[in-house]
Amino acid sequence: MTRSEVLFEQAKKTIPGGVNSPVRAFNGVGGSPLFIEKADGAYIFDADGKKYIDYVGSWGPMILGHNHPKIRQAVLDAVDNGLSFGAPTELEVKMAEKVISMVPSIEQVRMVSSGTEATMSAIRLARGFTNRDNILKFEGCYHGHADCLLVKAGSGALTLGQPSSPGIPEDFAKHTLTATYNDLDSVRAIFEQNPESIACIILEPVAGNMNCIPPVEGFLQGLRTICDEFGALLIIDEVMTGFRVSMSGAQGHYGVTPDLTTLGKVIGGGMPVGAFGGRKDVMQFIAPTGPVYQAGTLSGNPIAMSAGLAQMDALCEPGLYEALADKTKRVAEGFKAAADKHGIPLNITYVGGMFGFFFTEDNTPMTSFAQVTKCNMEHFRHFYHAMLDEGIYLAPSAYEAGFMSMAHGDAEIEYTLAAVDRIFAAMK
């Protein structure tokens, strides 16, 4: 047995399923997960000492690469001053100012400790501000594991939500309405049936939890129009896309202005963090200035703020996002070129520093959850393990996006595409 396999068996004795987040268990691809010992630049190293080019990047935060020297030094400097105070710090103010300077729709921002906390808090705030109970989300979009968000569409887009996890009372789920991503007609129909009860729409502007599905032209703007028409708030969940798709997030890239935005991942530089922010009149409705309660012992943790500020400062380097997008395009289009060369049905998507690939005969643009669920999962599993054997680490699920970092250079990209070519040649 490998050291990772031994550790996995050991972990299952004390940790449910042997992991602290389900996708890490490799249930989507089979086999035992890698246990990671360290990471540096574009590489991770497992417990057996094997090196892999990493396209997971801790699920998105490591946009500059692992163990970046400026971020590491910022953390070490902050540790010298103490780990946590449970009191305001100048670092929190600097982080808020940095976020607001980069995202025009955010006038005030509140720090929390996770993406789930951010979305949960933003929805509570939207409900309190509008005095409405219902929310609208999209099939295939993930916003953390809060009760009201673990809901699926049921038998159709207009079906009232049913819990998709035990432990969620139907009384909670009935207030979550589910529409079809990239389908404005489904959204308008739900609003017309519930014209005065929907507090907000929440969505991933690029759906990164059904692989990587960008919005079709006009979709985000159409949601803005519907929200304005019916008096609902628009919440754009940029926990994944924030500062990864562009310097001002996906909302800046696609030109849409939400009322509230949720953030995480990149703004922590690899440390646990989340945030939600938006219009000042809405944010003033949160305690202590307003009646909607939200609190957190570790919110604005100085270590996380230091790491995040170091990363955010580095992201302001001129040309960085253009270079990141070019790297992403090279990888995604390289996958497609190799697939076409060897007759492997494959579709691709990419935007900013995110990419997706789909083993499917469907060569039309990937725009929906329905298309994703029809992809060939066996081909994905085979490809996944073949890439591991080549020393390339991808997300262990066909429903997760790939992430590029600035640490991926020509050598890593060229090696990756050569490996893809070898694997596709053998799959014919």
UniProtKB/Swiss-Prot annotation:
**Cellular compartments annotated:** Cytoplasm
E.C. designation(s): 5.4.3.8
Q: Which cofactor does it need?
A: pyridoxal 5'-phosphate
- In this UniProt entry, the residues modified to N6-(pyridoxal phosphate)lysine are 265
> What's a GO cellular component annotated to this UniProt protein?
cytoplasm
Q: Could you name the domain of life of the organism this protein comes from? A: Bacteria
Annotated pathway: Porphyrin-containing compound metabolism; protoporphyrin-IX biosynthesis; 5-aminolevulinate from L-glutamyl-tRNA(Glu): step 2/2
One Pfam family name is Aminotran_3
Question: Which terms does the record give in the GO molecular function aspect?
Answer: glutamate-1-semialdehyde 2,1-aminomutase activity; pyridoxal phosphate binding; transaminase activity
Gene Ontology annotations of biological process type: protoporphyrinogen IX biosynthetic process
Q: Which reaction does it catalyse?
A: (S)-4-amino-5-oxopentanoate = 5-aminolevulinate
Q: What keywords does the record list, in alphabetical order?
A: Cytoplasm, Isomerase, Porphyrin biosynthesis, Pyridoxal phosphate
The EC category is isomerase
| Record-stated family | Belongs to the class-III pyridoxal-phosphate-dependent aminotransferase family. HemL subfamily.
> What do we know about how this protein assembles, alone or with others?
Homodimer.
Question: What name does this protein carry?
Answer: Glutamate-1-semialdehyde 2,1-aminomutase
Q: Tell me what organism the protein belongs to.
A: Shewanella frigidimarina (strain NCIMB 400)
Gene coding for it: hemL
